[in-house]
From Swiss-Prot:
This is Pre T-cell antigen receptor alpha. InterPro entries: Ig-like_dom_sf, Ig-like_fold, PTCRA. GO terms for biological process: alpha-beta T cell differentiation; negative regulation of thymocyte apoptotic process; thymocyte apoptotic process. Component of the pre-T-cell receptor complex (composed of PTCRA, TCRB and the CD3 complex) that plays a crucial role in early T-cell development, particularly alpha-beta T cell differentiation. Isoform 1 acts to retain most TCRB intracellularly, while isoform 2 permits higher levels of cell surface TCRB expression and facilitates signaling from the CD3-TCRB complex. Gene3D superfamilies: Immunoglobulins (2.60.40.10). Disulfide bonds join C47-C107. It comes from Mus musculus (Mouse). It is found in: Membrane; Cell membrane. The chain crosses the membrane at residues 147-167. Glycans are attached at N67, N117. It is a single-pass type I membrane protein.
Length: 199
């Protein structure tokens, strides 16, 4: 589910990414997104690698920071693209308070065991924090209004249904009563004579 969401995000935010040349992996960083995780702001950075190696071949994707350390990232892929090439995806989440310690951020990939590393341009995260897209919870005023209208509509339909049932029942009752008045009264059988015992 997360992978589908990230691929859709990259499709919206990075529509003009160049493809790799002659099967050489091409890493590209998407604009970072600000998330709220456990009450703390985190910066989510996604690296998309076009023309990655197919499954079974070594094609690592990793992030490195300006301080020389490699960062742990979640890597997805490779997945088959509609044009027949393979695509890999890696995501990294960093606390917003620590962004300056990890600048500049670079995404790397290697085509194989003996291949040369391919890297993105360095990404300055602290300047991106003000322009990054935010994914904070927003008030659901419109949703509450829709729920109210839906409840009102359901109540109105219920009242119409109840009125229809009552009218149908009263109409049937009138037919039953009218039918009883039109029928001749039931014939009475003659009762046997009563014998009195005189004492």
């Amino acid at each position: 589910m997360a992978r589908t969401w990230l691929l859709l995000l990259l499709g919206v935010r990075c529509q003009a990414l160049p493809s790799g040349i002659a099967g050489t992996p091409f890493p590209s960083l998407a604009p970072p997104i600000t998330l709220l995780v456990d009450g703390r702001q985190h910066m989510l950075v996604v690296c998309l690698v076009l023309d990655a190696a197919p499954p079974g071949l070594d094609n690592p994707v990793w992030f490195s920071a300006g301080n020389g350390s490699a960062l742990d990232a979640f890597t997805y892929g490779p997945s088959l693209a509609p044009d027949g090439t393979w695509t890999s995806l890696a995501q990294l989440s960093l606390p917003s308070e620590e962004l300056e310690a990890w600048e500049p951020l670079v995404c790397h990939t290697r085509p194989g065991a003996g291949g040369q590393n391919r890297s993105t341009h360095p990404l300055q995260l602290s300047g991106e924090s003000s322009t990054a897209r935010s994914c904070f919870p927003e008030p659901l005023g419109g949703t509450q209004r829709q729920v109210l209208w839906l409840s009102l509509l359901r109540l109105l339909l219920f009242k119409l249904l109840l009125l229809d049932v009552l009218l149908t029942c009263s109409h049937l009752r009138l037919h039953v009563l009218a039918g009883q008045h039109l029928q001749p009264p039931p014939s009475r059988k003659s009762l046997p004579p009563t014998h009195r015992i005189w004492t």
